[in-house]
A protein has these predicted regions:
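Membrane-embedded segments
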Residues: 14-106
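Hydrophobic/aromatic residues located in beta-strands of well-ordered beta-sheets
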Residues: 70, 189-191, 230
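Substrate-gating cap/lid alpha-helix
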Residues: 200-230
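Start-of-domain marker
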Residues: 1-14
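Secreted/periplasmic serine-hydrolase-like ester/acetyl group-modifying domain
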Residues: 74, 83, 87-188
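Active-site segments of SGNH/GDSL-like serine hydrolases
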Residues: 181-207
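Second-shell loop/turn segments in exported
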Residues: 43-48, 162-167, 203-208
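N-terminal post-signal-peptidase region of extra-cytosolic proteins
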Residues: 2-5, 50-57, 174
Length: 230
């Protein structure tokens, strides 16, 4: 479970370049980042993550180390939504500064079982490496037919959403990212837009959200690019 294990990776894997994002970034291997930037690297992903959850990951990361570069996947879906959908899935006790309450995780019977299983699997050469951990592309076969089979095409909306429909939610999310940038001026932050499927954009167009989504992307660029370390 990424929400449990990202805390440990952020605390214990020293890296000069850190990739943070949703499952859209999960298949970018750390080894690729190492090769590209010539530095040590680690990937920290929270599937369908909210900015409050990414904030917890960042707090742990910067509490234990000061990476040279953070690469953050600026997903459109997560950028434009508010925090109303956040669940209790994030184990707050693993992300706070108190090591004593981590005991409930360390002595959990499932944790002990899977830890022993992982250690034995790695010993036998059958376990996942950190490079492959939490990737999901190895057992999937993608083509246009399977993509269309899983796509429920919406009806065309009667009206377009106003361009500023997401403005306030985007501003609230960007305020979180701005705090990372301003509190860590010696770290370079590279924000990128993960490549969404053409079916995503078809859905956006048919739902009348095109201008609102583009406005959100422009808002992100205008907000973040004003900083020297972005």
């Amino acid at each position: 479970n990424e929400r449990y294990q990202m805390a440990g990776l952020a605390k214990n894997v020293e890296a000069d370049t850190v990739l943070v994002g949703t499952s859209m970034a999960a298949n970018y291997r750390s080894s690729w980042i190492q090769e590209t930037f010539g530095t040590s690297a680690v990937r920290l992903t929270i599937p369908d993550g909210y900015y409050s959850e990414f904030d917890q990951v960042m707090n742990v990361l910067f509490r234990t180390q000061e990476p040279e570069r953070v690469i953050f996947g600026l997903d459109v879906n997560t950028l434009i939504r508010d925090e109303s959908g956040v669940t209790a899935a994030m184990p707050d006790y693993l992300y706070n500064a108190n090591p004593l309450d981590d005991i409930q995780y360390l002595l959990n019977k499932d944790t002990l079982y899977y830890s022993a299983y992982t250690l034995l699997s790695n010993h036998w050469g059958e376990g996942d490496t950190i490079d492959e951990g939490f990737t999901w592309d190895r057992n999937e076969w993608w083509n246009h037919i399977s993509a269309l089979e899983n796509y429920d095409r919406p009806e065309i909306a009667a009206e377009e959403l106003p361009a500023d429909a997401y403005r306030d939610d985007v501003a609230a999310n960007l305020a979180v990212a701005e705090r990372w940038v301003t509190e860590h001026p010696d770290t370079e932050f590279d924000f990128f837009l993960p490549p969404y499927s053409i079916l995503f954009w078809d859905k956006v167009i048919r739902e009348g959200r095109t201008e609102a989504v583009f406005a959100a992307i422009r808002q992100a660029g205008q907000t973040l690019l004003q900083y020297d370390n972005v």
